[in-house]
Every structure is written in structure tokens, then in C-alpha cells.
Amino acid sequence: MENERAKQVYLAKLNEQAERYDEMVEAMKKVAALDVELTIEERNLLSVGYKNVIGARRASWRILSSIEQKEESKGNEQNAKRIKDYRTKVEEELSKICYDILAVIDKHLVPFATSGESTVFYYKMKGDYFRYLAEFKSGADREEAADLSLKAYEAATSSASTELSTTHPIRLGLALNFSVFYYEILNSPERACHLAKRAFDEAIAELDSLNEDSYKDSTLIMQLLRDNLTLWTSDLEEGGEQSKGHNQQDEN
């Protein structure tokens, strides 16, 4: 088992360097299927692989949606229909990737997580991938994805508040993504600002005790929290018109 594990981790690293993220994900899924607690390195390889696989499709979907709206506003119905068909294909790919990693998390990762850090990491991932589903789903499907995302983020936050320091990069990354969820998915800039500001302020208060190893990661996420706060606060001051241009940043 250890030989197989080492082999798949090596292949994942190789595919990351070659920017072959689909193969990177497949290698790390084989490691996860061994039903053992992943090391920090393995956990990060799995996360990076999926982030890149999903990130490319999310970017495609946003571009297609924007072009589709422009074609509709010009009255070019035939072009809009072509784009919609293509966007639907991208949505099918997005759904497949999201449900794939969510199944891996529930079946192979959460049951074998023994540390608070791992538990927070995996529930944050669940929140993220249900959020990605909510980005393009509609009606009852969107409502369900949003509800499951909220529950996962809440579980991660509950665990993080007792298990991780306020400056821990995973706790900060969770606050960053959870606040984006409130802003983009639940259309609640007030709650988004409150969550982001609280996380930022709590981390600032403990900055002197920041672990040297994670200093760069933590301060980068704090900067993203502050950038989002600046954007969202200006939106609120301008009468609540939300920035739907996806200028706000999450960890991806």
C-alpha cells in the first residue's frame, strides 16, 4: 500500500509540474481511496488539482455567460442560443467535477480525519464546491446547493473556532470564502462584511504570534479579506448596488 501511495503522490507532483491537472486529480483520488489520513502535502496536492480543474471551467462559464448576455441585449437570438448550448455543456462538466470531489470528501476524507486542521480543511472544501454548484444552478437546485454550502461552512467555522488560531491560514481562508458565499450566493453584503471584518480584526490582534512558516500565506489572505471589505463597503455606501463583476476574491 505504501509503495502505491508514494507512486501516486509522485505522479500527482509530476502532473502538477506538467500542468496536467486532470491526471493530477486522478492520482490523488487513488491516494484518497486508500482510506488513510492524508498528510498535509497530500491534502494540498488533492486541493490544488481540483482547484485547477474546476477553475478553468468556472472561468469559461463566466466568460460565456457574459457574452450570452451581450448577444441577448443586441437581439442576436441565434448566437445567444448557440452560446447557451455551449454553456450548458460547461455546466455539466462543472457538476461532474463538484459531485466527484464531494463524494471523495464524504467517503474517503472526513471519516479518516483525526486532526482539527484536517476536519476544517475538508468541510471548507465541501462549502467551496457546493458554492461552485450554486454559482450556476437555478431554482430548487441552487437553493439546495446554497443550503449545503452554508451547512459545510458553518461546520468548518465551528471546528476552526476551537481548533485553529485566528491567524491560521486555513481559518483565514475559510473566513474569506465563507464571506464571498454570503456576498455572491446569499446576496448579503452586510453579513459578508461582518464576517470578513471580524476575521481580519481577530488576526490583526494576534499578528505578533504569527507562525513564521505560515506568515506569507496568512498575510496574503488577510490582504484579500481587506480588498473585499473595501469593495463591499463602497457598494453598501452607494446604496447596496452589488458588484456582480466577480471582482471580489476567494482563495481560488
Curated annotation (Swiss-Prot):
Keywords tagged on the record: Cytoplasm, Nucleus, Phosphoprotein
InterPro entries registered for this protein in UniProt: 14-3-3 (IPR000308), 14-3-3_CS (IPR023409), 14-3-3_dom_sf (IPR036815), 14-3-3_domain (IPR023410)
Xref: Gene3D superfamilies: 14-3-3 domain
Transmembrane feature ranges: none
Location in the cell: Nucleus; Cytoplasm
Cellular component aspect of the GO annotation: cytoplasm; nucleus
Any GO MF annotation of the entry: ATPase binding
Cross-referenced PROSITE patterns: 1433_1, 1433_2
Keyword set includes Nucleus: yes
Function recorded in the entry: Is associated with a DNA binding complex that binds to the G box, a well-characterized cis-acting DNA regulatory element found in plant genes.
Protein's recorded name: 14-3-3-like protein GF14 omicron
Lineage, highest ranks first: Eukaryota, Viridiplantae, Streptophyta, Embryophyta, Tracheophyta
Gene name linked to the record: GRF11
